[in-house]
Amino acid sequence: MKCFDISDWQDYFTSVDDFKKAKDQGYDVVIVKLGESYNETECCRTQILNAISAGLKVGIYYFSHAYDLETCGYEANWVISKLSEIGLTPWHLQAGIWYDYEDHTRLRSHINNGNLTYQGITNIMCDFVNRLNNAGWPFVGIYSGYSLLWNETYMYSQVPWVPIWCAQYNSTCDYPDVYMWQYSDQGDVCGHSMDVSEVYKAPWLEEPPKKKCDCGCSCCSK
């Protein structure tokens, strides 16, 4: 199953027609950036609802800047609140919620200084998943690069049941039992270069949650 992900860098890709063309090209799933640093991605609401209307399965991701459990809690609460504000339910987000915890300069500084241990990273990842699960979101996972996931966390050894979306730009994905593998940042989506992934395990797509929404939006009223 083919997937692509979009953010504010793809603010040109928002219409129902855009997503219908992606579906015609063979893409079944899209993951939309919800936000970062407690700021909502400007075009995410339009992208989410129009992708659903076009018949794609939709998920969201939140880019993390959490380096301790307290900040992780703030981020989780922000995501929960924002999803409620938008009026989204598990029925809308059948491709899940993903905590984007990837390597960058500030994170690397915390690791190198000893302020953030491998166990600390693992605890943060698990805390976000647990908080969202407890808030009624059953399909929550972690997105990150292979090197960080495998070499600097204990996700596979301690919590192998947590869904993993692994980025590794290679001919194969070396992380075991991934749910999704982001294999390129230069995939063709309707003539645009985007991040693309392969979906391997998606029980939520096979047995989607029952529709429980009376918000009146176009995608729910069909």
PLM region descriptions:
Residues Y62, S144, Q168:
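Short beta-strand/turn micro-motifs composed of small residues
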Residues M1-D8, V16, M155-K222:
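Functionally critical loop-and-helix segments that line ligand-binding/catalytic clefts
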Residues R106-R108, L149-E152:
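Short catalytic/ligand-binding loop motif for oxyanion handling, primarily in non-cytosolic enzymes
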Residues V58, P138-V140, I164:
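Hydrophobic anchor at the start of a short beta-strand
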Residues A135-N151:
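Aromatic-lined carbohydrate-recognition surfaces of secreted/lumenal glycan-active proteins
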Residues M1-V129, N133-A135:
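Substrate-binding cleft of extracellular glycoside hydrolase catalytic domains
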Residues D28-V29, L148-L149, V162-I164:
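Accessory recognition modules or surfaces
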Residues T71-Y74, W150-S157:
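Glycine-rich, charge-decorated loop segments at or immediately adjacent to ligand/cofactor-binding or catalytic sites
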